[in-house]
Each structure stands twice: as structure tokens, then as C-alpha cells.
């Protein structure tokens, strides 16, 4: 990563805290934070902060977040929505329109899979991280095809590790 892993997590926590006292109060104590990147290791280092910010937002909506412990579901949903925005901004910073479109596609497809009760959000995340900025997500919306693309781009072992960590977070 361009920044250290600790800096990545600090950046997410500090920005959220500065934005809202509600977000600051939802932060876990430093010693209880789980600083484990899930999908960012599959992609380019320059995307790590944006990916993990968006993924933390996703975990607030659908799983077990690493940095935050909101007091209720409404706060979790609002904080998750908030984190999507700076994550997208961080990805847009390198002037990569395709990368921002990929993130929007990721969020939309994962929400659709969740709403339909269909498995495969981990595969979508893996492909989206591994292929960020390449624009291929528009070509397929099938989790199996996306997972195969992720494995080809990032390697079988790296994708397996990410999917395993994801399953622990979202069940």
C-alpha cells in the first residue's frame, strides 16, 4: 500500500470522526479495532484506502464492521452510506472515471444480490478490487464469471483468502 496499513485505518477513522460526533462515538476503542484488509490486497496499492473505506461502509450495512460499533441499526446504515462517499472520492482522485463507475456497479450489484437473497457478493467484491479501473465489470453481472476474472487477475490464493475473510464478516 502507498500508506501503511495503520495509516489507512487511521485515515478512515479520523475522517469519519471529523465529519460527525455521531461517527466519532461509533468508533470502537483503538484496541478493539480489527485492522484486516479484505479486498484491497487484490488490487493496486493506490486504490487501497478507497476500497477499504467503501468496504467498511458495506460492512456497516450487511456485516460486521472492523472500525465501528454503532449503537443501533439506523446509525449503522447512515454511517455506511456516509463511508461510501469518501471512498468513491478517493478512487476518483486519480481521475479514473472507469474506476468510479466500477464502484457504483459494485454497490448496485451487491445490493441487488442481497435483496434477492442470492449469494455471490464476495465474488463481485473480489473482481471489482482486482480489476478496478479496467472497466470489465460492465461485461458481466454473474458472480461466477466475476470470481473467475478476479482469480485470473489477482491469483487463486489471494482471492480465496479475501473470500474467506469476507465470509467471516458477512456470513
List the model feature ranges, each with a label.
Residues 1-171:
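All-alpha prenyltransferase/terpene-synthase fold signal
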Amino acid at each position: 500500500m502507498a500508506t501503511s496499513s495503520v495509516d489507512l485505518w487511521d485515515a478512515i477513522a479520523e475522517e469519519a470522526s471529523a465529519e460527525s460526533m455521531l461517527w466519532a462515538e461509533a468508533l470502537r476503542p483503538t484496541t478493539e479495532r480489527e485492522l484486516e484488509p479484505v479486498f484491497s490486497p487484490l488490487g493496486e496499492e493506490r486504490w487501497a484506502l478507497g476500497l477499504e473505506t467503501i468496504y467498511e461502509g458495506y460492512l456497516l450495512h450487511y456485516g460486521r464492521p472492523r472500525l465501528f460499533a454503532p449503537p443501533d441499526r439506523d446509525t449503522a446504515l447512515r454511517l455506511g452510506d456516509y463511508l461510501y462517499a469518501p471512498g468513491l472520492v478517493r478512487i476518483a482522485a486519480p481521475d479514473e472515471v472507469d474506476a468510479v463507475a466500477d464502484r457504483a456497479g459494485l454497490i448496485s450489484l451487491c445490493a441487488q444480490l442481497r435483496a434477492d437473497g442470492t449469494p455471490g457478493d464476495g465474488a463481485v467484491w473480489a473482481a471489482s478490487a482486482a480489476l478496478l479501473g479496467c472497466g470489465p465489470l460492465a461485461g458481466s453481472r454473474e458472480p461466477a464469471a466475476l470470481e473467475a476474472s478476479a482469480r485470473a487477475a489477482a491469483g487463486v490464493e489471494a482471492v480465496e483468502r479475501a473470500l474467506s475473510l469476507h465470509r467471516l464478516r458477512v456470513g
